Amino acid sequence: MGPLMLDVLGYELNAEEREIIQHPTVGGIIFFARNYHDRAQLRALTKDIRKTAAKPLLIAVDQEGGRVQRFREEFTQLPPARAFEQHNNGIELAKKGGWLMAAELLAMDIDLSLAPVLDLGFDCKAIGDRAFSDDPKKIIKYASQFIKGMKQAGMATTGKHFPGHGGVIADSHLETPFDSRENIKEHDMIVFKYLIENNLLDAMMPAHVVFDAYDDKPASGSDYWLKQVLRQDLHFKGVIFSDDLNMKGADVMGSYSERAIAAQQAGCDMVMLCNNREGAIQALDGLPQVNVPILDTLLKRPTGEYQELIKTSMWKETEKEISRLSLEWREKHS
């Protein structure tokens, strides 16, 4: 599988996208809200992508819940991660939420929801209620259950944003944040460390944040954070994704091809470049044509179709509980 994940523009593939998807460097497609009209359209799109690619290809989406849920109509409305902490039955509900999110996507032939968020909430604009808590010990508790639910459904898990995005107010979608704390390894990073030690993470996504007490590069392009800390010190054996290299937080890494190459050389197995077709093509031309076998470990196993899933008692009961939690959260925070 190739090392580049990119996006498509709409509900259907256009001629240029059909050609791009067949390029040997392309190993993944990530969906956004603009790619979704209804389940029938989405299913047709995933089928077309797999047929066109004629090779193993990861199909991913950000379907965390709350404000980061790309597919809404005809899917369960998922609560943000923070909702679990604020419910007295939140531990059990977190596992059910992880299962439901994953099961619905797998039934649509989507391999991955890039989840869960393992950052501390703090006041970070990019994170906020996407975090389970502001307390790392509580994040470990809730995230572990959410992950177990995802794995029960059959989906690989992606922890983000290593070693922790929550300590900066700036949004890395809009600018390059700097975090000067020296204690991040003893604070934010303990969440990632625990989950790695307990074999709960299949993939990792680093932050577009410069931790300047340690290195002058964003973690997503830093061999210090990816090779030394994540691989050597924490013994992480899974896949490393870059976050979207079109984000402003990656601007300090150079041109689009330079960003992709820098992220790959720093230790990313798959680099992501979205919402910029010209930039994606630059990355496509700049990256070496290599096969990355570890990416195959994230492909979904065969599952039933969505119509079969929603007939099961487990889906019906879980959907009712998670929908209720989501509604309660929205009413409380509207």
UniProtKB/Swiss-Prot annotation:
Catalytic activity annotation: Hydrolysis of terminal non-reducing N-acetyl-D-hexosamine residues in N-acetyl-beta-D-hexosaminides
PROSITE patterns per UniProt: GLYCOSYL_HYDROL_F3
A single GO molecular function term of this UniProt record: beta-N-acetylhexosaminidase activity
Keywords: Cell cycle, Cell division, Cell shape, Cell wall biogenesis/degradation, Cytoplasm, Glycosidase, Hydrolase, Peptidoglycan synthesis
Site (Important for catalytic activity): D171
Compartment(s) of residence: Cytoplasm
Name of this protein: Beta-hexosaminidase
Native organism: Photobacterium profundum (strain SS9)
